[in-house]
A protein has these predicted regions:
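Glycine-rich FAD pyrophosphate-binding loop
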Residues: 1-14
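Helix-loop-beta segment of a Rossmann-like dinucleotide-binding subdomain
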Residues: 49-60, 74, 94-133, 154-155
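Flavin-dependent oxidoreductases
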Residues: 21-23, 146-223
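Dinucleotide-binding Rossmann-like beta1-alpha1 core, especially the glycine-rich loop
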Residues: 18-96, 216-221
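Glycine-rich nucleotide phosphate-binding loop and flanking beta-alpha elements
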Residues: 9, 67, 123, 175-176, ...
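Helical element adjacent to the flavin cofactor pocket in flavoenzyme catalytic cores
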Residues: 109-167, 171, 175
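Residue-level detector of anion-binding/catalytic polar loops
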Residues: 84, 136, 186
Length: 223
């Protein structure tokens, strides 16, 4: 049973960036991310519902020695999980992606298999797949109370009705802290502002431009 306080994608999902990357800061995260991309591709065929995937790849650039070492370590990890990754020097980056100012760039890694997806479309694809496997989804059903007995979860109260259960998966994003308090659990989570800029059309910008991540400047761009 999935309980949605409003409607699917009505929270922060609708304006999410939708980046689907494979490379993570650790082996475990890399494995999970690769599984996610594979799952989306599989479900597109299984439930006949698009995930809105655009396989344009992703380019991460480094402007400090520390960041360059980090990206190279991540590239090694990616190779262990058969993730296609290519290490590029600044000259190659400038040649292939002239939109990038490489004056301060040391190098970068290209992940051709990375993609971007439509968050709303992905959500409804997952919901469709879940329903086909017997899941029930109830919208406009905010959880009013989490019921515990002898220190264990025993149910939730929704619209004055009690649903008995043994386990709860809390997937409420930035609202998880408040929901956790209903069960006496302290979740150290606090939302932070995030900004994005939409530009005017850029002449001759390739439709296949990869997502470009500049971690040193805490920014990314995508077409």
């Amino acid at each position: 049973i999935l309980l949605e306080r409003d409607q699917l994608t009505s929270g922060t999902t609708w304006h999410a960036a939708g980046l689907v990357s494979q490379l993570g800061p650790s082996a475990a995260i890399t494995k999970i991310r690769k599984y996610t991309l594979d799952l989306y591709k599989e479900l597109e065929k299984k439930v006949d519902h698009s995930a809105g995937l655009r396989l344009n790849g992703a380019l991460s650039i480094a402007e400090t020695k520390g960041r360059w070492q980090e990206l190279q370590r991540q590239a090694t990890t990616a190779q262990l999980y058969d993730v296609d990754v290519r290490i590029l020097d600044k000259d190659q980056i400038k040649k292939d992606y002239p939109i990038v100012n490489t004056e301060d760039v040391i190098g970068g890694i290209l992940m051709p298999g990375d993609s971007a997806a439509d968050p709303k479309v992905v959500t409804h694809m997952l919901a469709k797949a879940a329903r086909q496997e017997g899941a029930q989804i109830f919208e406009k059903s905010p959880v009013e109370e989490i019921i515990t007995k002898d220190g264990k979860i025993s149910g939730v109260k929704v619209k004055g009705q009690t649903i008995e259960c043994e386990y709860i998966v809390l997937a409420s994003g930035m609202w998880s802290r408040q929901i956790g308090e209903k069960a006496g659990v302290s979740i150290p989570l606090y939302p932070a502002e995030h900004f994005y800029i939409i530009t005017e059309p850029i002449e001759n910008l390739s439709k296949t431009l990869p997502t470009i991540r500049d971690f040193d400047n805490r920014t990314y761009i995508k077409e």
